[in-house]
């Protein structure tokens, strides 16, 4: 998943059971195509699907950040930290991050906005359609 992240993200070649192929760098597509059994993997796929449904973007970032948080939480559990303490820590971190957003916000130039739109559309549509839609913004 990490390798699909960002404007220089790499495409993935997906092959289903019937040999059909799909090339994509869309995180939710990669995940929803995967066959997984592990409950945590299923939870991450569900999180990605929710992100896609709500924002239509950010699925890979959501999964990469969530997976890293889970990895760190597991290390804390292995060190003897109670899961409830970890959950409280995540809640405090969320509150702190949300309180900082206003101070971190910047005014973007038209060029930066266009670049962000193009990045968001990359790999989701035909390239000509991506260029056309990004100019409409």
What are these regions (language model features)?
Residues 1-136:
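N-terminal glycine-/lysine-enriched basic segments
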């Amino acid at each position: 998943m990490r390798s699909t992240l960002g404007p220089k993200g790499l495409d993935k070649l997906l092959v289903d059971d019937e040999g059909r192929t799909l090339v994509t760098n869309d995180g939710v597509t990669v995940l929803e195509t995967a066959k997984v059994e592990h409950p945590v993997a299923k939870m991450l796929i569900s999180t990605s699907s929710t992100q896609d449904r709500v924002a239509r973007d950010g699925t890979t970032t959501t999964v990469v950040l969530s997976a890293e948080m889970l990895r760190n939480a597991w290390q804390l559990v292995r060190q003897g930290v109670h899961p409830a303490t970890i959950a409280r820590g995540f809640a405090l971190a969320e509150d702190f991050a949300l309180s900082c957003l206003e101070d971190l916000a910047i005014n973007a130039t038209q060029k930066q906005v266009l670049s962000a739109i193009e990045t968001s559309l990359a790999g989701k549509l035909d390239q000509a359609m991506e260029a056309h839609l990004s100019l409409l913004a």
